[in-house]
Amino acid sequence: MAKAKFERNKPHCNIGTIGHVDHGKTSLTAAITKVLAETSGGATFTAYDQIDKAPEEKARGITISTAHVEYETQNRHYAHVDCPGHADYVKNMITGAAQMDGAILVVSAADGPMPQTREHILLARQVGVPALVVFLNKCDMVDDPELLELVELEVRELLSKYDFPGDDIPIVRGSALCALENKSPELGAEAILKLMAEVDKYIPQPERPVDQPFLMPIEDVFSISGRGTVVTGRVERGIVKVGDEVEIVGIRPTVKTTVTGIEMFRKLLDQGQAGDNVGVLLRGTKREDVERGQVVCKPGSVKPHTKFKAEAYILTKEEGGRHTPFFTNYRPQFYFRTTDVTGVVTLPEGTEMVMPGDNISVDVQLIVPIAMEEKLRFAIREGGRTVGAGVVASIIE
């Protein structure tokens, strides 16, 4: 049967399932597709084993296994990611390979919160996942309502500990297995529909890139005789129009200038928008005043910084990373958007070294400022070879 084409007339949202191994993330993903396929036709049922053998993808030089399913509710169209292994989650969330606008935290009612439950909540906080909804799975295995209350309380405390609004986050009780096997509808299909209603309501609709303030990383600089300097790149977000005042940020002191022309495929345009590869002509800017690695942006929308806290994943030897651990004062290059900048890594108190395969929170001090904000992704490199990936968790200065 041919794949039905999804009508893109509903707002789009990216979500994923997170939580401890074997708590039922993949079963829940399968159950959502099954229930929506049967009730509203908003999905194609994708069985557990189809999701579980997820294809490998490369993101920022790192191989990650991720399964993607899509479905829609009355209100929204969703792209949903599910990862087979814990390491895949860590890599996925840190590289932003699958951007999450929100996530469903799956907790087994029979086991309660476990180490990876905690770790995924912390990661979600560090990489800036805006909102979580909880699915308390395997409720068919728990007869004692007081035990369910207790697990729910534990989950709320854990969420609050990592700065999520634990008291307000919706928690839906159910059983993905019941939904897949058409048993006890109140724990099965009905619980799944209730969960999706909460996801619709509680996870905020993300702002589209085109509605955000203009930013374009500079990839190349040319001078065109008699016309001035052209910077080229792919517009990351927002819209730029001829006549707009912009700032050039990063590496050097910030300068203001005006856009006097925009071209794409050798044609002149009135504006460029998120996703376009364009050349932007800048008034009165000399070729030697701008360089790859800077950004052109809406004035005041992004500032240059040198010091930040990051959440990073360090590649294993098998993934092409380092063969040995590193220590505090490690000096690799940090690849932001289009360029490498050297930086010094400070490990947290009590951490002696970082092994390949670890994920860790570190402080980084760059030797030159880069236009940055929270959630910005980067690669960690040594001589052009990727040895890790990271995300800016917070800016220090």
From Swiss-Prot:
Residue ranges of the region described as G3: 82-85
Database matches in CDD domains: EF_Tu (cd01884), EFTU_II (cd03697), EFTU_III (cd03707)
Enzyme nomenclature, EC number: 3.6.5.3
Binding site for Mg(2+): T26
GO molecular function list: GTP binding; GTPase activity; guanosine tetraphosphate binding; translation elongation factor activity
Subcellular location(s) of the protein: Cytoplasm
GO cellular component: cytosol
Domain of life: Bacteria
Enzyme class: hydrolase
Coiled-coil segments: none
Entries under Pfam families matching the protein: GTP_EFTU, GTP_EFTU_D2, GTP_EFTU_D3
InterPro entries (UniProt xref): EF-Tu_GTP-bd, EF-Tu_GTPase, EFTu-like_2, EFTU_2, G_TR_CS, P-loop_NTPase, Small_GTP-bd, T_Tr_GTP-bd_dom
Keyword Hydrolase: yes
Keywords, in A-Z order: Cytoplasm, Elongation factor, GTP-binding, Hydrolase, Magnesium, Metal-binding, Nucleotide-binding, Protein biosynthesis
Start and end residues of each stretch annotated as G5: 175-177
Subunit and interaction comment: Monomer.
Homology family: Belongs to the TRAFAC class translation factor GTPase superfamily. Classic translation factor GTPase family. EF-Tu/EF-1A subfamily.
Role this protein plays: GTP hydrolase that promotes the GTP-dependent binding of aminoacyl-tRNA to the A-site of ribosomes during protein biosynthesis.
Name of the protein in its database record: Elongation factor Tu
Originating organism: Azorhizobium caulinodans (strain ATCC 43989 / DSM 5975 / JCM 20966 / LMG 6465 / NBRC 14845 / NCIMB 13405 / ORS 571)
